[in-house]
């Protein structure tokens, strides 16, 4: 598990004394929060206003404070029990974005409990374990907090209290393989990650996934290599000949659309230099400008005369 420590503060006070018997689960309560702006704010703010150890968001984890040090994070007596305090951002715009961070959140909370030698239990009557801020608010001595996070935010994305407890105590069950919603398809790996803004070969077939992780289908894409690629309605990258919008195109083995002259099964074809569509029933001037080639109605190069020059200069083809 990769953790960014670029904003780790080393000047935070110790709260309480070891051993620390709890890992605290929070969410930021800020609908505009990002992992970076939360880390930046935590870096410069007065610790007496509160501090924590980790932030999860935007597909990454940032550690901003020490562990095994206590924290001012729950507003009461259990500040002195904080082995680690983890914040989840609240600015996700899609379920996929949320689930990416939720997986990291669950994994981090469980890993921190293991690291501290604590049971991976959630909000139980035992002092030791993983506790939500809500549970601390309702059960800690000398409470001065009214926070109930992270439950309301989790519920917004369909994670019930029961589901959260199950995931904390048993690990997150990841639905792998192809997934679908109203927007489209995406592909989930065994670690919960999914391809974004890249080609990926799945079961022998190449696909392309956009910046949000959705599979491209029935559309063109100009890649950073300067080549055009076509993905059919199943998402499969085109190779060889493909008929698209009543025009024929040719794609090489790497999926790149070809232009100009192409030799296929010992026969020459010409593909429009700009658009890539196969030229048929037309003349193409030679590169040196000294003559013309004729492409038959099926697009193949004529290797013998297939046209006639009439007395009035009109050229007719057979």
Swiss-Prot record:
It catalyses: Hydrolyzes the link between N-acetylmuramoyl residues and L-amino acid residues in certain cell-wall glycopeptides. GO terms for cellular component: extracellular region. SUPFAM superfamilies: Cell wall binding repeat, N-acetylmuramoyl-L-alanine amidase-like. Keywords: Cell wall biogenesis/degradation, Competence, Hydrolase, Repeat, Secreted, Sporulation. GO terms for biological process: cell wall organization; establishment of competence for transformation; peptidoglycan catabolic process; sporulation resulting in formation of a cellular spore. GO terms for molecular function: N-acetylmuramoyl-L-alanine amidase activity. Its EC number is 3.5.1.28. Residues 19-151 form the N-acetylmuramoyl-L-alanine amidase domain. Cell wall-binding repeats lie at residues 175-194, 196-215, 217-237, 238-257, 258-277, 280-301. It is found in: Secreted. Disulfide bonds: none annotated. It comes from the Bacteria. Autolysins are involved in some important biological processes such as cell separation, cell-wall turnover, competence for genetic transformation, formation of the flagella and sporulation. Autolysin strictly depends on the presence of choline-containing cell walls for activity. Belongs to the N-acetylmuramoyl-L-alanine amidase 2 family. The C-terminal domain could be responsible for the substrate recognition. This is Autolysin. The gene is lytA.
